[in-house]
C-alpha cells in the first residue's frame, strides 16, 4: 500500500498547553503558515500575538473559550467572544456546559448553543461547538450535535484529548450519510495519515491536533 498523503488545509494546529510560552506560540504559527493549514487554535490571551503573526496568511485564527470544563457562565463566554473578536480572531471554539447536558438539562444546552451562535454571528466569527463526549451518553452527544446544526454553527468537536478509539466511537454516534452544513471535527494526538484517512471515511471534515507537524514535511 502506498503512502497516504496528508491534506494539510484540513488540519487545525492547536496549542492549549497552559505553560506554552510566546516562543511556543510563534513556532505554532510559523509552522502552520509553512504547511498552509486551515487554522490555529489557541487560548484568548495569545490572540493578539497570533493575529500579528498570521496577518498576511490565509490561516484562520481560532480562540478556545471555556476549555476544558465548559462551566464558565454564558455571560463570560460571550464577553470573551467579543474580546477575541476585537483582538483579531476569525473563529471561536466554545466548550459548552456539557456537565449540564450529562445531567439531562437539555434546555440549558439548547439555550446556550443558541446564544453562542447569536453572539458569534453578530461578530461574524465562525463557531465550533465543543464538548467532552467521553462522559456523555450517545443521546446527549447527538442532542448537542443536532442543536449545533439547528443554529447553523460552523463546526462540531466531540472531544479534545480523546484517544483514537474514543474519537472513532464518538464520530460513529453522530455521523450520518446525510449531507449536513456543519463540519465535523475530530482530535488526533499524533498526525497519523492512516488514522486521518479512517476518520475522513467516517465523515470527519477537519482534524484538530497538537502533534508535531514538522514530522510530515
PLM features: residue spans?
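Conserved N-terminal beta1-alpha1 strand-loop-helix module at the mouth
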Residues: 1-86, 147
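Alpha/beta catalytic cores of nucleotide-metabolism and tRNA/nucleoside-modifying enzymes
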Residues: 2-23, 179-183, 192-217
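Generic structural signal for hydrophobic
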Residues: 28-32, 84, 116, 120, ...
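Helix C-cap/helix->beta junction micro-motif
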Residues: 35, 57, 122-123, 151, ...
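Active-site-adjacent beta->alpha loops and helix N-cap segments on the catalytic face
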Residues: 42-59, 72-78, 99-119, 135-141, ...
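Conserved mixed alpha/beta catalytic, RNA-binding, or beta-rich assembly cores of soluble enzyme
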Residues: 62, 76-80, 85, 91, ...
Amino acid at each position: 500500500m502506498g503512502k497516504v498523503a496528508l491534506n494539510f488545509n484540513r488540519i487545525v494546529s492547536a496549542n492549549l498547553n497552559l505553560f506554552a510560552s510566546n516562543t511556543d506560540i510563534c513556532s505554532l504559527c510559523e509552522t502552520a503558515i509553512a504547511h498552509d493549514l486551515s487554522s490555529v487554535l489557541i487560548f484568548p490571551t495569545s490572540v493578539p500575538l497570533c493575529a500579528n503573526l498570521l496577518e498576511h496568511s490565509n490561516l484562520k485564527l481560532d480562540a478556545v473559550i471555556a476549555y476544558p470544563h465548559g462551566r464558565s457562565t454564558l455571560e463570560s463566554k460571550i464577553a470573551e467572544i467579543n474580546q477575541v473578536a476585537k483582538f483579531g480572531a476569525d473563529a471561536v471554539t466554545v466548550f459548552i456546559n456539557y456537565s449540564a447536558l450529562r445531567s439531562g438539562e437539555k434546555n440549558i444546552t439548547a439555550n446556550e448553543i443558541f446564544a453562542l451562535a447569536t453572539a458569534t454571528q453578530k461578530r461574524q466569527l465562525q463557531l465550533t461547538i465543543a464538548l467532552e463526549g467521553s462522559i456523555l451518553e450517545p443521546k446527549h452527544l447527538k442532542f448537542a450535535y443536532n442543536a449545533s446544526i439547528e443554529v447553523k454553527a460552523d463546526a462540531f468537536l466531540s472531544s479534545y484529548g480523546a484517544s483514537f478509539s474514543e474519537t472513532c466511537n464518538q464520530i460513529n454516534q453522530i455521523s450520518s450519510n446525510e449531507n449536513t452544513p456543519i463540519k465535523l471535527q475530530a482530535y488526533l494526538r499524533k498526525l497519523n495519515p492512516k488514522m486521518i484517512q479512517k476518520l475522513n471515511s467516517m465523515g470527519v471534515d477537519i482534524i484538530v491536533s497538537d502533534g508535531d507537524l514538522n514530522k510530515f514535511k
